[in-house]
Swiss-Prot record:
<dbReference type="GO" id="GO:0007156">
    <property type="term" value="P:homophilic cell adhesion via plasma membrane adhesion molecules"/>
</dbReference>
<dbReference type="GO" id="GO:0005509">
    <property type="term" value="F:calcium ion binding"/>
</dbReference>
<feature type="domain" description="Cadherin 2">
    <location>
        <begin position="138"/>
        <end position="242"/>
    </location>
</feature>
<dbReference type="Pfam" id="PF08266">
    <property type="entry name" value="Cadherin_2"/>
</dbReference>
<comment type="function">
    <text>Potential calcium-dependent cell-adhesion protein. May be involved in the establishment and maintenance of specific neuronal connections in the brain.</text>
</comment>
<dbReference type="InterPro" id="IPR020894">
    <property type="entry name" value="Cadherin_CS"/>
</dbReference>
<feature type="domain" description="Cadherin 5">
    <location>
        <begin position="455"/>
        <end position="560"/>
    </location>
</feature>
<dbReference type="InterPro" id="IPR002126">
    <property type="entry name" value="Cadherin-like_dom"/>
</dbReference>
<dbReference type="InterPro" id="IPR013164">
    <property type="entry name" value="Cadherin_N"/>
</dbReference>
<keyword id="KW-0130">Cell adhesion</keyword>
<feature type="topological domain" description="Extracellular">
    <location>
        <begin position="31"/>
        <end position="691"/>
    </location>
</feature>
<dbReference type="GO" id="GO:0007155">
    <property type="term" value="P:cell adhesion"/>
</dbReference>
<feature type="transmembrane region" description="Helical">
    <location>
        <begin position="692"/>
        <end position="712"/>
    </location>
</feature>
<feature type="glycosylation site" description="N-linked (GlcNAc...) asparagine">
    <location>
        <position position="417"/>
    </location>
</feature>
<dbReference type="InterPro" id="IPR015919">
    <property type="entry name" value="Cadherin-like_sf"/>
</dbReference>
<keyword id="KW-1003">Cell membrane</keyword>
<keyword id="KW-0106">Calcium</keyword>
Amino acid sequence: METALAKIPQQRQVFFLTILSLLWKSSSEAIRYSMPEETESGYMVANLAKDLGIRVGELSSRGAQIHYKGNKELLQLDAETGNLFLKEKLDRELLCGETEPCVLNFQIILENPMQFFQTELQLTDINDHSPEFPNKKMLLTIPESAHPGTVFPLKAARDSDIGSNAVQNYTVNPNLHFHVVTHSRTDGRKYPELVLDRALDREEQPELTLILTALDGGAPSRSGTTTVHIEVVDINDNSPQFVQSLYKVQVPENNPLNAFVVTVSATDLDAGVYGNVTYSLFQGYGVFQPFVIDEITGEIHLSKELDFEEISNHNIEIAATDGGGLSGKCTVAVQVLDVNDNAPELTIRKLTVLVPENSAETVVAVFSVSDSDSGDNGRMVCSIPNNIPFLLKPTFENYYTLVTEGPLDRENRAEYNITITVSDLGTPRLTTQHTITVQVSDINDNAPAFTQTSYTMFVHENNSPALHIGTISATDSDSGSNAHITYSLLPPDDPQLALDSLISINVDNGQLFALRALDYEALQSFEFYVGATDGGSPALSSQTLVRMVVLDDNDNAPFVLYPLQNASAPCTELLPRAAEPGYLITKVVAVDRDSGQNAWLSFQLLKATEPGLFSVWAHNGEVRTTRLLSERDAQKHKLLLLVKDNGDPLRSANVTLHVLVVDGFSQPYLPLAEVAQDSMQDNYDVLTLYLVIALASVSSLFLLSVVLFVGVRLCRRAREASLGDYSVPEGHFPSHLVDVSGAGTLSQSYQYEVCLNGGTRTNEFNFLKPLFPILPTQAAAAEERENAVVHNSVGFY
């Protein structure tokens, strides 16, 4: 406990002192109602909505509640109409005892916004109790020597009612010797005394019986009676006299049973039996008598435990009686001292165990504290721990509200165990703790968050449909339906991208699937956005960028751009016989639609008519000579080259290259007949045979002179016709060969053009000299060279 008390100054503390209560009462006017006790249940006390100044329906919508001290429901509120009804009969004497006025405090609490209203119901007393004497019979012993005017105390009657309904007067039945006088104590209670009017004579009348009546002030009046039996004794001159008529003593309430309280003392001047004094309790006041007295010594002890919270003062009337029956009376005023024997009590009036996370200053609990002790023992300190986002706010009449200090964050902390500590200021301090559990309810205040800011995924082309490519994942810090995420494909920025035909997504787990086979050569990569939406209301969403990269497969063989591979007439390259070793004949140009290493091409010479004469550079496809040409080398050569990529599996293409060795570029040339296809060669041979036969037939029909003339003409025409049929189709020889890669297919010094015109039955070769700057002095010579045309008829068999 000491450790806990040491921590209290470090906590948020709210001191609730009596002065605070008084200030609150003075500044906050309570709504007061009054009604008589014992009113039948169902009685309408008032219309609460009207008295509070709010609409009738507002009581229901704002969750109006009534709280009472002690948690006993005395009233019932109809929130729809605002009427306040009595739930049961109320007994003022049971609820308030002798306290006047009898005020029942209750609080009305409204929510949204939180409001408190202090309300009081005062119960007025009705005369529903009659006076009652503690004994049905009283015994008095009066000596016959008593003088008129002598006063004899009588026991008072008790009436549970208060005010005018309590005992107001005492009477005695008519007689010759006594009358009753009614006196008031300091607290207003009435008590009777019997006054002797006429001297008594024991020999004439040894006994008397009187009827003592107690009357209250109600209308109609109620009464109670007791019998007073008087014995007249022989002369007893002196009655006992107490040393003090009033004894005042203070007794702590925690004194044990049989604890000593005080000693009273009385003396009697008579001698003998008339001087012997005995002590007794004359009359106790209250429900029970917690004291006993020793009849010989006059010592008063506790017979029951005292409780300051129930009765703080006791007035004990002590009677001292001598042997002759005379008595004297004194009063012992016992003040019960409060000790800190009651721990503070905490009563939860309203509790909200589920608090929305985004609400500020939400009332979590309404509670009241009380301590039955007084003074510092009843002053209290109320506190909660520092490290939680909650505050304690005092309202009124020992009421507090526990509110959130600001908006809570369920994602940071979903549950709080709040310990409310109430300590009094007594010695030693007593402490009461109450722990409430507050759960933070989720609000959809967090959008889904992707595990990556962007995603890059790879898929090989020629994939199978429905292939699982990858998974997009998002999380939501909320809970329940607020954290349930659905995924979707967002419309692409590129309207030409048919995303719905390429990709699909599983709405529940974010798995991406390919809808069809992808082609790297058609689409290398594409981007799109994936959205994640939670199930809250309103729903929150986020999106992330997904970049899909199509990986190339080696599904394309190299494609040769040059030389053109045409089934009708392959291309022929010219090689000067005087070419030096390393002479560039041509360059094989090829491409591969694949990418990366699948498009890395290499060249290889597979086969050649003269293997040692030619070589191919592996990386650029240049075909060069490896040595000087000799007279023994053939004039025509056929090379078979292989172009292959670096993929897996490897793909390749073959290139056939024809090389014609010429003495110089100044000589006319034609491709050999053998370079044509075999089917065309066969056709040419048949045609030649027919022309020879036709020429022989015509020659035999003419005279020798005519035959010679005509024969020469016919032979020339036949040969021209034959050469015309052997002509190569136009366009098979590129007019200007340009190195696509920039390395140069032909030597920069030689650009040539071959034109074969079959329509004129002549073969024309146009040779272009190397391009050199033409000086003015050379203009004429250059002009003559430009007009040079050579006409030759050359046949290859």
